[in-house]
């Protein structure tokens, strides 16, 4: 998963933003000045020996933001990095969910293809029984044709699933950051993941572990710092300077210390609206936290309901429906051999068993997909 391009990009973005706070807490670069003041002529050194107004000067000045501004700028940058860190976690979870989605779809397709190939062999044996009965005058040609038609349908489904498997393999390789021409990924066995969470535990997990909420809370904290910084806009910024001016021979040198201040003279048009803007953005960030908490809770609840429902369905398939369907096909075959039921009954029993087995694997895959979607919201739940 660490080779997934989206995950790599999110990590690099986070690492880049971690370099910003120290920059924002650092004073602006000082300015160095070199100047020459001539007298009576623009020519260099004019008045050097005749006027005490001539000088060649060297100076340095430093901008100093108002008290607390640099600290708050650094705090805001830290929150930007924190947001990026949670976005990196979210990218990891999203990539994991996509990987698992493709994997479990491949699992379903692999199992279904194996099932279709196995059941097609059983169908060919049923077809042979129908042919044998037809040869001795106890069956109909229509029975053989029905078996052949069902076998063709199954073959068509196998071809369709193979085509879909190729697409899913491509999706899985892309999610893993592998080349498309790399070897296909082997699909192993899958067992239902046990999820033992009640609604209270689920709500707590959402509040503590949802990456979307972590992003929103970091954004809310950022908006708090941005409001504090906006309020600091009423305080002036300063410029401190020092200069040394060398005069001609016989005259005294000059030494100059300066202190300047940037006054927020038009505060009602700049600083006050900026504070109002920051306050509104803080309110929006708070509401966003609440909105995402409700959305994440509802989504997690939906997935938990789906998990519990599929748990029950898997037990019903494994312990009830499939064994009953297996008994039904055996009974139908036995009755068909002695002409107690028609061939349509046998085909119907065969198709019922095939569909139930396919539905079992579909339910198992959907169960694991729901677990993957839940873990995208709240992290690991095993």
Where in the sequence are the language-model features?
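Amphipathic alpha-helical coiled-coil segments
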Residues: 7-24, 91, 95-116, 125, ...
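Small/polar-residue-enriched beta-strand and adjacent coil segments characteristic
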Residues: 30-90, 214-292
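Short, charged, amphipathic alpha-helical segments
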Residues: 74-78, 141-149, 343-351
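Periplasmic alpha-helical coiled-coil/stalk elements that build and connect Gram-negative outer-membrane
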Residues: 88-207, 303-306, 310
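Short helix-capping/hinge motifs at transmembrane helix termini and TM-loop junctions
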Residues: 137, 177-178, 339, 378-380
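Metallo-beta-lactamase
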Residues: 161, 211, 363
